[in-house]
């Protein structure tokens, strides 16, 4: 039985709680139809990575195996249910989004039901989150792309209105820009 997702979730959550942060966990609901093509593309990439992992395994190439192993991971419904149970046992709130979790979290921050969305993804800003916190890592490190190396990171608070003002655009223009670059 795989438990690494729970160990990681527990240690990250405990670290946040020790710092006085009470996270609210927002889980994705049904993905929008518009994302179906993207989901299929991601599935194909995972299958390709699995094939390359097996090829590297046959050659006993540990570096290539490690490189492709991380690209093959999947979250099952059981893993998500276990994560929800752990979060609940920690006494933290769980929100089940009707669709995309990023949109739900952004809405909650807009309505002052939370300080900021915690995510590496900028989508919550496109959905109107007033604040986004990135790089919430315990170790202060993050994997460098698809390499084996790591880079040092620090938490980053991004204020939507400040950035819109600096760019000289409004929220609707940010949405159009996001659509043009494909986020």
Residue ranges and their predicted role:
Residues 1-46:
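Non-catalytic, usually N-terminal nucleic-acid engagement modules in DNA/RNA processing proteins
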Residues 37-183:
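Extended two-metal-dependent nuclease catalytic cores across DNA- and RNA-processing enzymes
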């Amino acid at each position: 039985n795989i438990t690494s997702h729970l160990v990681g979730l527990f240690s990250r959550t405990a670290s946040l709680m020790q710092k006085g942060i009470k996270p609210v966990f927002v889980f994705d609901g049904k993905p929008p139809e518009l994302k179906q093509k993207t989901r299929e593309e991601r599935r194909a990439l995972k299958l390709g990575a699995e094939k390359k992992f097996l090829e590297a395994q046959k050659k006993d190439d540990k570096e290539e195996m490690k490189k492709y192993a991380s690209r093959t991971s999947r979250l099952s419904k059981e893993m998500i249910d276990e994560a929800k149970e752990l979060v609940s046992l920690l006494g933290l709130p769980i929100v089940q989004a009707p669709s995309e979790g990023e949109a739900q979290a952004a809405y909650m921050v807009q309505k002052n039901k939370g300080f900021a969305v915690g995510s590496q993804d900028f989508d919550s800003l496109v959905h109107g989150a007033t604040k986004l916190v990135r790089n919430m890592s315990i170790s202060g490190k993050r994997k460098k792309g698809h390499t084996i190396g790591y880079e040092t990171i620090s938490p980053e608070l991004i204020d939507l209105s400040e950035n819109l003002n600096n760019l000289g655009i409004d929220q609707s223009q940010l949405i159009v820009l996001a659509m043009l670059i494909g986020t």
